[in-house]
Amino acid sequence: MADKLTRIAIVNHDKCKPKKCRQECKKSCPVVRMGKLCIEVTPQSKIAWISETLCIGCGICIKKCPFGALSIVNLPSNLEKETTHRYCANAFKLHRLPIPRPGEVLGLVGTNGIGKSTALKILAGKQKPNLGKYDDPPDWQEILTYFRGSELQNYFTKILEDDLKAIIKPQYVDQIPKAAKGTVGSILDRKDETKTQAIVCQQLDLTHLKERNVEDLSGGELQRFACAVVCIQKADIFMFDEPSSYLDVKQRLKAAITIRSLINPDRYIIVVEHDLSVLDYLSDFICCLYGVPSAYGVVTMPFSVREGINIFLDGYVPTENLRFRDASLVFKVAETANEEEVKKMCMYKYPGMKKKMGEFELAIVAGEFTDSEIMVMLGENGTGKTTFIRMLAGRLKPDEGGEVPVLNVSYKPQKISPKSTGSVRQLLHEKIRDAYTHPQFVTDVMKPLQIENIIDQEVQTLSGGELQRVALALCLGKPADVYLIDEPSAYLDSEQRLMAARVVKRFILHAKKTAFVVEHDFIMATYLADRVIVFDGVPSKNTVANSPQTLLAGMNKFLSQLEITFRRDPNNYRPRINKLNSIKDVEQKKSGNYFFLDD
């Protein structure tokens, strides 16, 4: 019985429908044929049940199931013990827990569906860990005995005795208006227990929003409001689930500084974040999570910030001698053509233009772009990046200035609201029939974005990240001269972001087209950009879109507005933010090098 639990069977509750099939899984299972009850299911049962002790991992039932509801995952051999929580039979399980330390910020990094939010719930005391015994959950005494000798024992004892108060900033801020009613100011006044409301509001730019109703706030405003509500309450454990989605680069750093200002020798702070440069800036130490999404997740020991993120990118945990991803993710900045060479390939020009919308005025400096090139637009929210994209697409007419060249345009908007009823396959078939079966497109776009896994689901039931990937595939599948992509990384986890960036880059090179991308995730922006367009001015009053610059010049200009400096990690070249007023930071500001390309 040495290998009694070396695999784990997952039955998808949504897809398994015993009433509609002939129980192929049970009929084809060799163990059942030998007369053992490995798979139990009848046409009357709600869902199939698979015994993990009897299963031999042959994988026949997976292939036979007409709905694709089963998956059987072989576990690394050291995962029989240390189960922290399992939801029910044949469902997700989490191994170990991240270890928070008082007075420091713990960052969690890992893909979606790998148990970060479960870990947060358990550490907040909102979910009682059942140590894998889902049929008879243990009581707290047993749980404490189980964790004895680790820092978690003290932590859980404190939660039980001292009633440590935990607050979680939820992941999906767009759901907040359904729960919270009233103006921003009134809610903040109600929650303000530490009397720091004025300072926090100033840091997060919320002072001018106090009269607004919560349901009228945009995504970024809701995010800042949610962070503020958490920061002004009295608590011992602060948890932030993705505090940077919807925010632009400047606001991300402000949010990070606000979260770091909560540090106190007897407070625990835990952050889940997919933007690696923000995570780097925020955390004092990091736990990685690896495993198979929605099957099992494993938490590593805490590492230092740099080491933790590099381990996540390398896909290899040295302390456990375990590889959890085939390829490591490396950031080589693209070799950009010299300024002289670019001139020869010049294809398209756009004129200087002006556009006034209500109070807001945008001036665009004339520029030109070539094919096989990705332009990244850098600027805060409300500096007219989306307006510029819509003018290029011909959706908005300029008030003064020349005509925009008529181009075929494919546009992926920032907010994706699915209107279509039906499955993803039908949608792809309607919109991009030629592309989605084309072998080149399948290898370049469909496979890396993992559209296959969700192709038969209803479009209305997809999660944010799944919708984002479908939208990206639809956008790239439409034949066009120029692809306009607005925030391709929203809702995606760190690994999918890098995949998406790679997809866009490879597709643009192969198809010899141009792409304009709006992106706030710094790592993604540097990875994508051949040239950058910097937007400056006063947000939502009057702003200027400069003509395209090289990556180095543009980044220096943009970062000098934000007053941040970057260095490069020597191992995998990812950009890292320098801590404010550190030696490096002061040096680079003096010499005016805000951004480095050299290796």
Curated annotation (Swiss-Prot):
Residues 79-315, 342-562 form the ABC transporter domain. GO terms for molecular function: 4 iron, 4 sulfur cluster binding; ATP binding; ATP hydrolysis activity; CTPase activity; endoribonuclease inhibitor activity; GTPase activity; iron ion binding; ribonucleoside triphosphate phosphatase activity. SUPFAM superfamilies: 4Fe-4S ferredoxins, P-loop containing nucleoside triphosphate hydrolases. InterPro entries: 4Fe4S_Fe-S-bd (IPR017896), 4Fe4S_Fe_S_CS (IPR017900), AAA+_ATPase (IPR003593), ABC_transporter-like_ATP-bd (IPR003439), ABC_transporter-like_CS (IPR017871), P-loop_NTPase (IPR027417), RLI1 (IPR013283), RLI_dom_1 (IPR034348). Induction: Activated by encephalomyocarditis virus (EMCV) and HIV-1. It is an enzyme of class 3 (hydrolase). Residues 7-37, 46-75 form the 4Fe-4S ferredoxin-type domain. It catalyses: GTP + H2O = GDP + phosphate + H(+); ATP + H2O = ADP + phosphate + H(+); CTP + H2O = CDP + phosphate + H(+); UTP + H2O = UDP + phosphate + H(+). Disulfide bonds: none annotated. ATP 2 binds at G379, E380, N381, G382, T383, G384, K385, T386. Changing K20R: Abolishes ubiquitination by CNOT4 and diminished the ability to recruit autophagy receptors to damaged mitochondria and to nuclear encoded respiratory chain component mRNA-ribonucleoproteins complexes. It is found in: Cytoplasm; Mitochondrion. There is a cross-link at K20 (Glycyl lysine isopeptide (Lys-Gly) (interchain with G-Cter in ubiquitin)). Changing S489C: Confirmed at protein level. GO terms for cellular component: cytoplasm; cytosol; cytosolic ribosome; membrane; mitochondrial matrix; mitochondrion. Its EC number is 3.6.5.-. Belongs to the ABC transporter superfamily. ABCE family. Nucleoside-triphosphatase (NTPase) involved in ribosome recycling by mediating ribosome disassembly. Able to hydrolyze ATP, GTP, UTP and CTP. Splits ribosomes into free 60S subunits and tRNA- and mRNA-bound 40S subunits. Acts either after canonical termination facilitated by release factors (ETF1/eRF1) or after recognition of stalled and vacant ribosomes by mRNA surveillance factors (PELO/Pelota). (Microbial infection) May act as a chaperone for post-translational events during HIV-1 capsid assembly. This is ATP-binding cassette sub-family E member 1. It comes from Homo sapiens. The gene is ABCE1.
